[in-house]
């Protein structure tokens, strides 16, 4: 007789179970969320929408209370993102969660993907010209090589 082993987590079996989509309020991130939602619906996966509140160091140099400024901007953006996710989740039968972190977008997405045991990560292409020289969050996620990463233009 064969002894049964307790079921344990195994990445990449029978399609993705958790898809993480990074949001920052940009048009490309909203397109990425819509793409990820379609993928999650077709795969019957859970969609985890992740917004990482950036730390504004420039505000501190100008004497602005960083915590207050970041918090106000973040709350407005979080409200906008929540409203958008409610709109498209009502259209489809879709399991989803909304997560928000504070700090660096790359590290926030890595933390979220690790904690949620993500099978895939979807992000929007960077809209910043400077990222051609210093690298974007999407490029850093791809180079990490820890999950399949889809970059939506």
Explain the meaning of each model-derived region.
Residues 51, 124-126, 153:
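Short secondary-structure boundary segments
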Residues 8-65:
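Small/aliphatic-rich secondary-structure junction motif
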Residues 66-80:
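A short acidic, glycine-rich active-site loop
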Residues 1-14, 87-121, 128:
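Structural beta-alpha unit
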Residues 120-144:
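Glycine-rich, Arg-bearing micro-motifs that act as flexible, cationic patches
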Residues 64-68, 115-117, 139-140:
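Short, hinge-like loop/turn segments at secondary-structure boundaries
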